[in-house]
Amino acid sequence: MALIPAVTRLTSSVIRILGCNPSAMTLQGTNTYLLGSGSRRILIDTGDEDVPQYIAHLGDVLQQEKASIDTILLTHWHHDHVGGVKSIVGTKLAEKDCRVFKFGRTDAPDVCPEIPTDIKLHPLAHNQEFTTEGANVRVVHTPGHTTDHVVLAMNEGTLFSGDCILGEGTAVFEDLFEYMKSLEKILDIKPQRIFPGHGNVIEEPIGKIEYYINHRNQREQQILQFFVQRPNENLQAMDVVKVVYKETPENLWPAAAYNVNHHLSKLEKEGKLRVSKSADEEFYVYQPTSAL
């Protein structure tokens, strides 16, 4: 993985502060972004909870900038994006009236265990705008990675992509059907560069987004063909993996099956497969177009 410094000024109005929480899932760590050029700034995401090194770096930046945080925008509910809220709100890093915003979840109660209940979460809305001196961002709801995921479109073609698009590798998702629609939505924005939630800046984002879309579409066609060739069989994800992912080491098959299940769910939503239940187990069966 490429090295990412703890603090990087990306533009005159964007400073990236690394969350100092590296792992297999977070890559170099969570990227958080300080927006604006005046004394009151917007912070996108807050890293993990209880990471003193991150809070120290954030504090140093704010001191150098002679600024504080008055708005926190959370791209989604995962702990490595919301965990730092409690170490910022109510401290010298933030204005007394600092507000925290997050889009509501639709799959579960909209509660973040890492955020104390006395810190109010204000709802985000699709196309809502936030402005501070030197920066303006627009909220774009992009479900798929999670139901509450948003990206933030900034002036001059900059997009903050959260975990929808990563600086390295491909993203994970809860709902592939929604995720693919969100990728198309981002493609329509035509970003000129992407500041991701993990990994380095993406300077040629259109190619990256198209790669994400094409990669998933190609895999989906392989999976669908597997069913077409077995039109009357009740099949599960691992049946697909053993054939479509036969070149993949067997110890990685469970992870492959996780992805395949997302594809199967998407194909079922599109009417290309149907669900068959037998002995409390779910199977998928090919659904010919003529049967629709």
UniProtKB/Swiss-Prot annotation:
Task: Give the enzyme class.
Answer: hydrolase
Give the enzyme's EC designation. 3.-.-.-
Q: Which GO terms describe its molecular function?
A: metal ion binding; RNA endonuclease activity; single-stranded RNA binding
Question: What highest taxon heads this organism's lineage?
Answer: Eukaryota
Lipoprotein among the record's keywords? no
Per UniProt, where does Zn(2+) 2 bind? D80, H81, D163, H198
Claim: Zinc is one of the keywords in the record: yes
Pfam families, alphabetized = BLACT_WH, Lactamase_B
Gene Ontology biological-process annotations: RNA 3'-end processing
UniProt keyword terms in alphabetical order:
Hydrolase, Metal-binding, Zinc
Query: Which residues of this UniProt protein bind Zn(2+) 1?
Result: H76, H78, H145, D163
A GO CC annotation recorded here is:
mitochondrial matrix
Report which residue ranges the record marks as coiled coil. Answer: none
Q: Which family does it belong to?
A: Belongs to the metallo-beta-lactamase superfamily. Glyoxalase II family.
Query: What name has this protein been given in UniProt?
Result: Beta-lactamase-like protein 2 homolog
